[in-house]
Amino acid sequence: MFIPREKKRQLPSSLFKFSAFCRGLHYHCFRIKGWQLPHTVPLIMLATLFVWMTVWVLGTLPYYSHGFKNEKPPLATRAGSSALALIPFIFTSGSRFNPISLATGISHEKLQVFHQYGARILLFISVLHGIPMLVQPYLDGKRSSGGDPAAGRTAMQEAWDNNPHFESGTVLIVLLVWINISSMRFFRRLHYEFFVFQHVIITVAFLANLFPHSNVTYMDSWNYLFATVALIIWSWLGRLVLSIYCNKLSTAHAQLENLNEGMTRISLKTHIKWKPGQYIYLRFPFLKVLQSHPFTITTIPSTDSDTSVIQILARAKGGITRKLYDRAKQGKTHIPVFIDGPYGGPNNLKGYKHILLLSGGTGVTCNFPLLLDLVRKMENGETECELIDFVWSVRSRSK
């Protein structure tokens, strides 16, 4: 674990060690029978959120109302308000352009863990909201009949038939279950583009069904939904402004070139500047105008010109990458494209004395520009780095 030398000179020894400990704690990941959990620090934060919400919902009595017919059970009320409060955070942590990244500098892909696990916490809290809504009429019917279970079941069936919130709630639970299942790594890898398409559709349907399910006059529940919609619009507008700036109200023109082993090199000139290791989203209007695909930039920006050349290496697997490869194979080497980004990127490495860059296969596309940037800075005396170990593991040597 390395701390930049320039920071080490400024920090006391104890603070330096504490900083190194925090970094080591963050990078560590627990594995349970092949299931990789989030990094330790996000895991602690998510566990704290889960425990706090669970204790707040389940730790207060009573769970059900007594003596007041058709009154909502307190357990369901607490769980419902908690679930609504989670929704704006879940949506904003899953957006590329979000206020959390702007305020903290944390790139949006590092917030995805809160987006994914926040949805799982939401599902758990939503189940705690739904179950008492069914149990309450059962208890009311049983109590009013002197303890007859059949009367309780009848009252529960009547509540289900006469209350439209049960139907909308069931739809919401089904949608939320599918959102969580389809977001698992296995399903994402099957067909990423289809995953993105259906994820957007199902999420919009989920948010739209929340409005009729929530009572607009009860505990200001719609305020959370309005906040969520506002954050979504703000994210879209931010990306639109960024896209207009990157593309100058026109499309860039990418050049395609086939390489060995199903690889395609995408090259395009642009005026935007980026940091080594960052990535961009490319939208090809003549292929799939409604979809954009992330690609890591393998080059570094020019320091002596207003324009730079972005080069991308894409392996043809399926979807857009296969279409690009086939297009280049047919001799169609030029294609218009919209640029969205750049996003992400590692921390500044110029303060480290010894740097180890590890890559596997096409993962080298992230580390190669870091290597180029460090070498250039070493030549210009702009870095503390004295030694770079570059390790690239591949299945076979290219012909």
Question: Where do the protein language model's features map onto the residues?
Answer:
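FNR-like FAD-binding dehydrogenase module
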Residues: 1-399
